[in-house]
From Swiss-Prot:
GO molecular function: NADH dehydrogenase (ubiquinone) activity; NADH:ubiquinone reductase (non-electrogenic) activity; quinone binding
HAMAP family: NDH1_NuoA
Name the UniProt record assigns to this protein: NADH-quinone oxidoreductase subunit A
Keyword Zinc part of the UniProt annotation: no
Broad class of where this protein is predominantly found: membrane
Species this protein is from: Rickettsia bellii (strain RML369-C)
Amino acid sequence: MLQNSELLQEYLPIAIFFGIATLVSSLIMILPNLLATKKYNKDKLEPYECGFEPFDDARSKFDIRFYLVAILFIIFDLEITFLVPWAISLGTIGKIGFFSMMFFLFVLTIGFVYEWKKGALDWE
């Protein structure tokens, strides 16, 4: 077993890496704000639409169903992120891992059927 000093030496390169990464990313975020010339112009603050004056407000209303479909997409996209590592390690996790994932898929299927029956996927 590693002693405390040996353990700290093992993690020292990782700590140095995170320190340098934090410093570089902070510099990248701060330096442009300090060094850039700031010329405020009315035209630069306008939304750009093919060189013409904007015809309409840039903010348009979306139907709430678009947000619902986006949330459903995120949920089922997360399902895939759980399925891929499970499928890769299926040979080593045994029956318990298999049946736990089947239960997970069953719960997601119940949720999908519920959304379908409630009409969340209908566009009419």
